[in-house]
Regions:
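Cytosolic catalytic domains that perform sulfur/thiol-centered chemistry
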Residues: 1-198
């Protein structure tokens, strides 16, 4: 399998209420030389996390120990900009398994789905509720249920449904990437091929 199966995730969350976060902010271009997916988490939001002398910027959210979890909650239009898949790699390598926003750039959304990070798009109103709940209590938990396609703010019980492509959903539930999926249905492909008269 390419990555762990994703069924239900219950976790606290890290709030990043900034709109139009682009892929160059997620992972600066100077860190894109590697071709493997490992190690990019160290440079996630590098220019926001660190000063020029590599000391942590105390006010940036990832450097605040009271916020942690496997869910990143971002502002509207998250993942815009260039199509670099390294942005999704950095998010996964850092430890996030889900990103919540009121809107995602299409290419970024697909890059996340391809590596096992679930992008959950919610309404603007629900996103605001999530931010407020986290600020009121940083340990508040969110439940993401991929099977039912629901996101629940456990502190209030407020719930909203989210959409996902059926093929991508099946892959995430099984921990498949595209190659894993093809290998899984190889016998079906061969049977179909053998049944063709040409």
């Amino acid at each position: 399998m390419a990555y762990d199966k994703f069924t239900t995730l219950t976790s606290s969350a890290v709030p990043l209420p900034i709109e139009n976060v682009d892929t160059d902010q997620i992972i600066p271009a100077r860190f894109l030389k590697a071709t493997e997916r490992k190690g990019f988490g160290d440079n996630l939001f590098r220019d926001w996390r660190y000063n020029s002398d590599n000391t942590p910027k105390e006010r940036f959210i990832l450097n605040n120990p009271i916020y942690s979890g496997k869910i990143l909650v971002g502002g509207k239009n998250f993942g815009s900009g260039s199509s670099r898949e390294h942005a999704a790699w950095a998010i996964y390598d850092y430890g996030f398994r889900c990103v919540v926003s009121s809107f995602f750039a299409d290419i970024f959304r697909n890059n996340c789905l391809n590596i096992g990070v679930l992008p959950v798009q919610v309404s603007t109103e629900f996103l605001e509720q999530i931010f407020n709940a986290i600020y009121d209590n940083p340990t508040t938990e969110i439940e993401i249920n991929l099977k039912t396609q629901t996101i629940t703010l456990l502190s209030s019980g407020t719930q909203e449904s989210f959409a996902i492509n059926g093929y991508k959903k099946n892959n995430m539930l099984n921990g498949f990437d595209d190659i894993d999926y093809l290998q899984n249905i190889k016998s079906d492909i061969e049977t179909f091929s053998e049944s063709r008269p040409f």
